[in-house]
Amino acid sequence: MKTVYAGGEGEIVEKKSRFIATVRPVSSEEEAVAFINEMKKKYWDARHNCSAFVIGDRQEISRCSDDGEPAQTAGRPMLDVLLKEEIHNVCVVVTRYFGGTLLGTGGLVRAYQKATQTGLENSVIIDKIGRAHV
């Protein structure tokens, strides 16, 4: 099982729109929501602060938000990256500063996935070994 030991940040630019991915380890839904709200305050002037998180050893809790982007173009693609990478107890917020050019639904999906992947690449991810209870 993989988890985030130390969060990180990654940035990409697509057609003049800036996508800033911030990754943080979390252990509860409340912690994830607090982190999302923290990022919304930090990037209050951004057009969108989309998010996704996975919590639990078996990914028991997973949520995502498009934060005003067209349905299924931001939060779900971000969550798909986390699930594909099998990373647990993590929250990602991707902040978008609109650059004036519409990306279309396919462009948005690719941009949010790429930003999430970049944020993860700039984080410290470890393999967590489960302990057996006897």
Question: Can you say where each PLM-predicted feature lies in the sequence?
Answer:
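Flexible, glycine/charged-enriched surface loops at secondary-structure junctions
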Residues: 46-50, 125-130
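Glycine- and acidic-rich phosphate- and metal-coordinating loops
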Residues: 88-98
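Conserved small/polar residues in nucleotide/adenosyl-binding loops
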Residues: 132-134
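A short, flexible beta-alpha/helix-coil linker loop
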Residues: 60, 97-100
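C-terminal regulatory domains involved in ligand/effector binding and gene-expression control
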Residues: 1-73
